Each structure stands twice: as C-alpha cells, then as structure tokens.
C-alpha cells in the first residue's frame, strides 16, 4: 500500500524526484520553485511543485536546456496560462484587449521576436 501526502519535506521530495536536496535549494534560489515553509523555516513541497520539478528535471537532463533557458520557458508557460482564459469566442472588453496585448508583447520580447 502506497501512502501519498500533500506536502513533502525537502529530503523526501528529493528522494521522490531522484535529485539531491541541494539541487532543490538551487532551483529555489533561481526562482524556479517556491516551496512553502514551516514555522521553523523547513521547506515543504506540494504535489504541484513536485510536478514542476519533474518538468524542470526533464528539460535539463533529457532536453539539455540550461537553467536560464528553463527560466525563460517557465515564464512563457505562465504567460500562456494567463492568456488562455482570454481566448474565447466572446468579444473582449477594451480592458481585456489591452491586457492581452501587453501579455503578447511581453511574450514576444521573451522569445526574441521584438
């Protein structure tokens, strides 16, 4: 029987991911993940963060992308996630249209199209 928890201390998170705890600390310093903290400042990783770390591990180890590239890809993914709800058949309000335009401009700058 396997027991699943909602939050994992850094040692367990690292073990589950096949990574060293120091790697998780480095990713936190770079802003790739933001684990919550206990009152005693111990890191707690959610399942969502574990999935994000799995994706980072894949990008680094399997795709050969450096950490700067990973940061850029994750930023783009976050922008796309914010834009997706605006992509619907209904007409956009002027405010939504401005916001979408700003998000797209930011995305273009990030990928080097401006």
What are the roles of these predicted feature ranges?
Residues 79-114:
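C-terminal regulatory/oligomerization modules of transcriptional regulators
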Residues 1-62:
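Basic helix-turn-helix/winged-helix DNA-binding cores
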